[in-house]
Amino acid sequence: MALNLEKKQEIIKAFATKENDTGSCEVQIALLNERIKLLTEHLKANPKDHSSRLGLLKLVAQRRNLLKYIKRTDHARYVVLIEKLGIKDR
């Protein structure tokens, strides 16, 4: 259920703003987005797994807060990021 190392490195490479960048908002949001996708698939197969559902809600809230921060500080980065990830603009 967790991201494997290769997938995580692939996401970091795709969204990094500079070399060895693992902590920028773009990278964090992309990693959260992938974890949210995995948890969503898990919950489709296991609808009674309430602890995973709560974890999913926490991840979505964390992603939403990071997206709000990027939107507030640099709107151009925000637009590019949501287009790359395929997230709807609220």
Swiss-Prot record:
SMART domains to which the protein is assigned, alphabetical: Ribosomal_S15
UniProt-listed Pfam families: Ribosomal_S15
InterPro entries, A to Z: Ribosomal_uS15 (IPR000589), Ribosomal_uS15_bac-type (IPR005290), uS15_NS1_RNA-bd_sf (IPR009068)
Any one annotated GO CC term: cytosolic small ribosomal subunit
CDD domains in the cross-refs: Ribosomal_S15p_S13e (cd00353)
Coiled-coil segments on the chain, per record: none
GO MF: rRNA binding; structural constituent of ribosome
Alphabetical UniProt keywords: Ribonucleoprotein, Ribosomal protein, RNA-binding, rRNA-binding
Gene Ontology process terms (BP): translation
Family per record: Belongs to the universal ribosomal protein uS15 family.
Quaternary structure note: Part of the 30S ribosomal subunit. Forms a bridge to the 50S subunit in the 70S ribosome, contacting the 23S rRNA.
Function: One of the primary rRNA binding proteins, it binds directly to 16S rRNA where it helps nucleate assembly of the platform of the 30S subunit by binding and bridging several RNA helices of the 16S rRNA.
Protein name: Small ribosomal subunit protein uS15
